[in-house]
């Protein structure tokens, strides 16, 4: 598979990571985040989570500290929108997105437009409605709904990054342990499948839906 790299070590990159819930960013693009930190010297992250009770907020902050060195954090914010009820607070959500717009990110990670979870879909829609001239990648979250699509952009991940991502997720998000799908084999399997699809030399990859790109 042909590769096209548009980022260099000397690049300056302002990244925004958007998640409806406190583990979404890590599951969807945690490996890519770790790879960007390794490969891009001047990368900064805006880490935005839209919901979480006090326990989940503590998990989100601990996770942010694990994934991001302090000097790479431009903005970190956890909102308190009610989980699964985002659609009923659309005006407040939209107002907050207008605030985020002023951060002018170069690259945005957000939810998949066709995600079966209603909170995820709304966050994806508002991302596209707000950021009309930015590079947006939609990540995927495995779940009971069976809504994984056919992604078209892949980031190859070394085994060390794969293991680090999985360890962080399982060690930090203790509140999710009762979910049967929240296991190492789930997270590793989806990375392995995407690695097969993109002929990854390391066997693993994260995958994204890229709807618009200008070369």
At which residue positions do the language-model features occur?
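Short, amphipathic C-terminal "tail helix"
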Residues: 202-215
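Short polar/acidic secondary-structure junctions
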Residues: 143-144, 213
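A charged, well-structured terminal subsegment
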Residues: 160-186
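Active-site beta-strand->loop->alpha-helix modules in alpha/beta enzyme cores, enriched
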Residues: 1-143, 149, 186, 190-199, ...
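Phosphate-binding/catalytic loops
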Residues: 145-160
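Helix-loop "lid/cap" segments that line or gate small-molecule binding pockets
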Residues: 63-68, 156, 168-175, 190
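Short, well-structured alpha-helical patches and their helix-loop capping segments
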Residues: 112-119, 157, 161, 179
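Alpha-helix N-cap and coil->helix boundary residues
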Residues: 182, 199-203
